[in-house]
Amino acid sequence: MASAKAVQLAHSIDPEYKVGSMILAVTIYPLTPNPDDIIEVMELDNEVYLFSDVQALGAYPYYAKRVFEEKGVQLEISDEDREALTHTVDFVSFSYYSSNCAAADHSLGEPTGSNMVPTLKRNPYSKVSEWGWQIDPKGLALHPEPAVQPLPQAPVHCRKRLGCQRHPGAGRPR
């Protein structure tokens, strides 16, 4: 709601202003080819991108009700709120950090230690930095497609980050 009202205010000040949102981009692979793992990835993607979908599309996506019910959230939204949400961002930007895997059976795989999605697993095909971040440049190439399919505008990639140790005078980490 705050995003929609900020967009509305900015556009009322100057219709030429471009207002965007920024999301954390996470490529999530199924841990195995088990169809249940693929469904787990689809459900996690829905949760990860739910709010950027609202900001870019101006309404809650079809799956939001199910996600909220599963989390015990009761969304109270008025007609006035629904109208306000129509003030959508002009672009969605994203910051890609790493990829992960997911499995329907949460006991499988090595946990990543993610504080945002604790059920995520390490990708056994990715190298890992000394800080435990998975190194997966191909994940960046694969990421935008599922996340932005419903969006009316192309995404803007703002940065690629990697958690690693930096040493003064040693130059950029590789």
PLM features: residue spans?
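Active-site region of glycoside hydrolase catalytic domains
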Residues: M1-P173
